[in-house]
Amino acid sequence: EFHARFSAVRRYYNYRTRTNTFLLDRNYTWPVGSIDLDTLNEAASIIGGNHDFTAFSRHTEDLEHRRCIIYDSVWKEKGAVVNYQVSGNRFLHHMVRYLVGTMIEISRGKYEMAQFKQLINEPVENLNIYKAPPQGLVLTQVDYD
């Protein structure tokens, strides 16, 4: 039987950030100031594949496992708007926001790439990462079998 949530095989998210402030866009983007796009894409490339995202989810969920397959993970710049585009078979609660927040902190030099890699490769419950605000996050597409 079809279920809108559980029958999905792939989900696509877009997270919009801005490198400047534009008041009319403040409810739909996160103004992050200057960022290093190359660093963001280096971090985004680490996410691809089949990983346990325990470190990047809320821990109130009673889940059998926290593994997700990430098919695409890339940052794209268009003027002052920098979009993070990610697709995967599933996403944990707040996972995209935790990933975006942590990658932005890496870009700002406030978090180490090595720590990020370790959280992906050796997952632990982690309360010391930054969660991006909800503004900017959009579910753009869902694929069904």
Segments predicted by a language model, with ranges:
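Structured-RNA-binding interfaces characteristic of tRNA pseudouridine synthases
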Residues: 1-145
